[in-house]
Amino acid sequence: MASTIKEVFAEIAAPVENSHGKVTVVGVGQVGMACAYSILQQNLANELCLVDVVADKLKGEMMDLQHGLAFTRHCTVKADTDYSITAGSKLCVVTAGARQREGETRLSLVQRNVEIFKGIIPQLVKYSPDTCILVVSNPVDVLTYVTWKLSGLPRERVFGSGTNLDSARFRFLLSEKLNIAPSSCHGWIIGEHGDSSVAVWSGVNVAGVTLHEIKPDIGEKTDNEHWEAEIHKKVVDSAYEIIKLKGYTSWAIGLSVAKIAQGIFSNSRNVFALSTNVKGFHGINDDVYLSLPVVLGSAGLTHVVKQQLTEAEVQKLHNSAKALLEVQNGIVM
């Protein structure tokens, strides 16, 4: 084969092997592969590495993506159980983790995932010390905190997918109620990616028209149009419903992760609702990870948007922080 290659090509300089647009995805389950596929399909990376502990499935997923490369912009797809393959990654996306067993407490699930992360995070940092780490595994807020502690990286380079998808679901449901495009609805879900998330009704607007000014009790118990029940509750329940119907969620989170990756590679400075260390914001004084709107660039997070929340929204955010802090404090690192 080498002689044939020499007959085809005349080398004038050695090829560059290291990549400046490299993404690693850890975990090749439904979510991990949805992330990998979305990144590949949107031509965001020139090298995509997959890592998992199940060698056969890992190889199969790699081959399946490789066989589609003729239909995309060129991207090198690699896979291995050895983390050395991840060296030089600009972004590491962590989707691996244990699933909740029937009757298992949340803290028990978190602790099992902590043990898994102990084998993942130090390896990623070892081979890519300048990387940004995006945590997708659930419970995402607590595991992002765990990742920050295990990695030793500055807090701006460790963040979770958080309520970015929740915010997208929120806008979609608002768009259905208002009969306009989701991209024309502006609204945010902050706090925990989970049951204690907070819908920022005070900021929901269409073309600068704030719904809260038109209907001051929107989202509150006195709201006779039941916006909270019809919109926010559906946001919280939607993942449970999808899991009940098809067994897992994958495509929407994959698209969300691809959009975040695009923000890093293009240094677009878009605002996303990502899980970050919220100490010092909205009166929270502990190292707890929750989602707030943040500005994302090529080196990670640069700013937190200082939303003007109502007293009720701040209190709900504090309740969310308290619930997550209790879980964090129970973790054995």
From Swiss-Prot:
<dbReference type="Pfam" id="PF02866">
    <property type="entry name" value="Ldh_1_C"/>
</dbReference>
<protein>
    <recommendedName>
        <fullName>L-lactate dehydrogenase</fullName>
        <ecNumber>1.1.1.27</ecNumber>
    </recommendedName>
</protein>
<feature type="binding site">
    <location>
        <position position="249"/>
    </location>
    <ligand>
        <name>substrate</name>
    </ligand>
</feature>
<dbReference type="GO" id="GO:0006089">
    <property type="term" value="P:lactate metabolic process"/>
</dbReference>
<dbReference type="GO" id="GO:0006090">
    <property type="term" value="P:pyruvate metabolic process"/>
</dbReference>
<feature type="binding site">
    <location>
        <position position="169"/>
    </location>
    <ligand>
        <name>substrate</name>
    </ligand>
</feature>
<feature type="active site" description="Proton acceptor">
    <location>
        <position position="193"/>
    </location>
</feature>
<feature type="binding site">
    <location>
        <begin position="29"/>
        <end position="57"/>
    </location>
    <ligand>
        <name>NAD(+)</name>
    </ligand>
</feature>
<feature type="binding site">
    <location>
        <position position="138"/>
    </location>
    <ligand>
        <name>NAD(+)</name>
    </ligand>
</feature>
<dbReference type="InterPro" id="IPR015955">
    <property type="entry name" value="Lactate_DH/Glyco_Ohase_4_C"/>
</dbReference>
<dbReference type="GO" id="GO:0004459">
    <property type="term" value="F:L-lactate dehydrogenase activity"/>
</dbReference>
<dbReference type="InterPro" id="IPR001557">
    <property type="entry name" value="L-lactate/malate_DH"/>
</dbReference>
<feature type="binding site">
    <location>
        <position position="138"/>
    </location>
    <ligand>
        <name>substrate</name>
    </ligand>
</feature>
<feature type="binding site">
    <location>
        <position position="99"/>
    </location>
    <ligand>
        <name>NAD(+)</name>
    </ligand>
</feature>
<dbReference type="InterPro" id="IPR001236">
    <property type="entry name" value="Lactate/malate_DH_N"/>
</dbReference>
<comment type="subunit">
    <text>Homotetramer.</text>
</comment>
<dbReference type="InterPro" id="IPR018177">
    <property type="entry name" value="L-lactate_DH_AS"/>
</dbReference>
<feature type="binding site">
    <location>
        <position position="106"/>
    </location>
    <ligand>
        <name>substrate</name>
    </ligand>
</feature>
<dbReference type="InterPro" id="IPR022383">
    <property type="entry name" value="Lactate/malate_DH_C"/>
</dbReference>
<keyword id="KW-0963">Cytoplasm</keyword>
<comment type="pathway">
    <text>Fermentation; pyruvate fermentation to lactate; (S)-lactate from pyruvate: step 1/1.</text>
</comment>
<keyword id="KW-0560">Oxidoreductase</keyword>
<dbReference type="InterPro" id="IPR036291">
    <property type="entry name" value="NAD(P)-bd_dom_sf"/>
</dbReference>
<comment type="similarity">
    <text>Belongs to the LDH/MDH superfamily. LDH family.</text>
</comment>
<dbReference type="InterPro" id="IPR011304">
    <property type="entry name" value="L-lactate_DH"/>
</dbReference>
<dbReference type="Pfam" id="PF00056">
    <property type="entry name" value="Ldh_1_N"/>
</dbReference>
<keyword id="KW-0520">NAD</keyword>
<dbReference type="GO" id="GO:0005739">
    <property type="term" value="C:mitochondrion"/>
</dbReference>
